Regions:
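A structural signal for beta-strand and strand-to-loop patches characteristic of beta-rich domains
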Residues: 1-205
């Protein structure tokens, strides 16, 4: 199936069938979907980071973004559906937000079985902000000489290298400056601030 890239809308198909065979026709369903950030990784590229650029004003990953964003955003809430004669149905998730990183759409369909019990089935669809996924590998995450070596690669959403893809790498230097202040009673406190310098284009090709 086609991998969704920067979709504004996402159509999902449903098929409800009896265990003995044949579709469950004219059955009422309820569709719910959750959009949540996903960690991009590919076999053979474990040393590369595929994370989007961080906000330079944020000191660590735990502070970046709202915790509710990590838990997910409800993009479809108990939409009423009905299967056709063959047990098929479909629904479309509209107005998806602009993506800055890979996300998963967790879709759930609820229905009543012949015994009246509520049953739920689910599927997960990976959606991407771009058809090109950039990865960055640093030779080391610490440097004592003011220099850092890194490798950049471009993959498609299935993890295959893209030949001839133009890439531009920009850099930022973030420095945390701590100032010690003497408090009442002889105690000390530290005031930390982060200064960010734009290094511009580091390389392109």
């Amino acid at each position: 199936r086609t991998t969704p890239v920067a979709p504004k809308d996402l159509a999902l198909a449903v098929q409800l069938s009896y265990l003995s065979g044949g579709g469950v026709g004219q059955a009422p369903l309820r569709g719910t979907a959750l959009l949540r950030p996903a960690d991009a990784s590919f076999p053979g590229y474990d040393e590369y980071s595929f994370e989007p650029p961080r906000d330079p004003k944020v000191r660590n990953a735990d502070e970046e973004g709202d915790n509710s964003d990590r838990e997910g955003k409800l993009v479809a809430d108990k939409l009423a559906l009905n299967t056709d004669r063959e047990g098929a149905a479909s629904f479309t998730i509209k107005d998806l937000p602009k993506l800055m990183r890979a996300n998963d759409v967790l879709a759930e369909i609820s229905f009543n079985d012949p015994n009246g019990e509520v049953q739920t089935v689910s599927t997960t669809v990976r959606v991407w902000p771009s058809a090109v996924v950039l990865g960055l590998k640093a030779a080391g995450w610490a440097s004592s000489r003011g220099k850092a070596k890194f490798t950049v690669l471009a993959l498609d959403t299935s993890g295959k290298p893209i030949k001839g893809q133009a890439v531009e790498v920009r850099g930022r230097l973030a420095q945390t400056i701590s100032t010690r202040k003497r408090m009442v009673g002889g105690f000390y406190a530290y005031d930390n601030r982060t200064e960010v310098k734009d290094l511009g284009v580091l390389c392109s090709g």
